Amino acid sequence: MAKPEIELVELVHIAALARIGLGSGLVARSQWRRVNLLKPDDSDWLLEATRTIVGGRQAASEVTTSFLRLMLALETGSTFGRKPGVTSVSVDDLRKDFIDAVERAADFDWGSDRDPDLLWLSSEFRAAGGRNQLSVEELLRALTDWQKGSRSGRERVRLVDGVLPGDGLNTPNRVQEQLKGLIRQVGAEGFAQRVARLKRLYGDDAERYEKELTEAFDTHSNLVAGLADSAVMDRSRRLAIGAADWMGGRVAIARGTRGNPCGFCAMLASRGFVYLSERSAIMTAVGKRYHPNCHCFPIMRVTTDELPERNKFFQEMWPEVTKGHYGADARRVWRKWADSQRAKSLGGK
């Protein structure tokens, strides 16, 4: 059975967001590696990291806004506008807007006349060798599947007054304020504390000290990349909160995953749709259940006649995999199974 168009669009969106998040993380890691191990100085790196996050969040916002406009049109027959005075829009125009945003994410290039922070991100991505390090295959495959797949019968949809509310936190100063605790932890200040500790422990053993210092620096580079990735994803998830509010009434939310999620995310995906009617519940479901380096995104529906294919698969596998196991033991068995599925998909045994 062919997948509904809305499901194909969701898979494209998740793949595009993952690319933007991972690409921003790659840039942040490259910037961190310019820090002096022995004299970590926060100033230049902090400015670069903040601007990278701002650019990544702007890119994610562009993709997610165009996705939400199309998703709402397909699901509800109406959507929010970009400017006042227009009462309807063709679904083909919404598709084109989304494709344009996705193709920019695929190229990791936002053109010469775009927001300066997007230009910065594009330039830093090229300088870091991002095109050779970050595969675009998943996104292009999802985009091709959608373009060759089924189409909704809707042609035009009604535009409702109002625009999608954002999170209002995408200037360098606001990003730095919002993330200052985490930036300190993973940035130069946190690393300087680690260096001081290693010096106390291994200061008399130069070889051991150098080894531990290099390992600590590599660990921090991964933390920096994870921070940038998570900050980018958080921007889009907050836009989803605005969309859930915009839809009003009882909104059903399910976990949308990439092809091979971790056991935790696969478990949440297996639970299917949960109806949410209060903003606090939406905030919890959309904004607080994501681990570091997670690229899941909420699937939102007004009607829940059929689960998306991935969710349905995990829902069917849960009782089979966990048969005879309960509670924490069931979750342990499930995680082991999910890890084995991921290993197989990556060419393992």
Please report, for each region that a protein language model flagged, where it lies by residue.
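A broadly conserved sequence feature marking short terminus-proximal activation segments
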Residues: 182-268
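Non-catalytic accessory regions used for complex assembly or targeting
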Residues: 1-113, 117-121, 130, 134, ...
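Prokaryotic Sec-type signal peptides and long signal-anchor helices
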Residues: 71, 84, 102, 112, ...
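N-terminal nicking endonuclease/strand-transfer module with a His-rich metal-binding environment
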Residues: 59, 63-67, 72, 152, ...
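Intrinsically disordered, low-complexity regulatory regions
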Residues: 1-15, 33, 40, 96, ...
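Activation/maturation switch segments at domain boundaries
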Residues: 1-55, 233-349
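Residues at alpha-helix termini
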Residues: 108, 150-152, 245-249
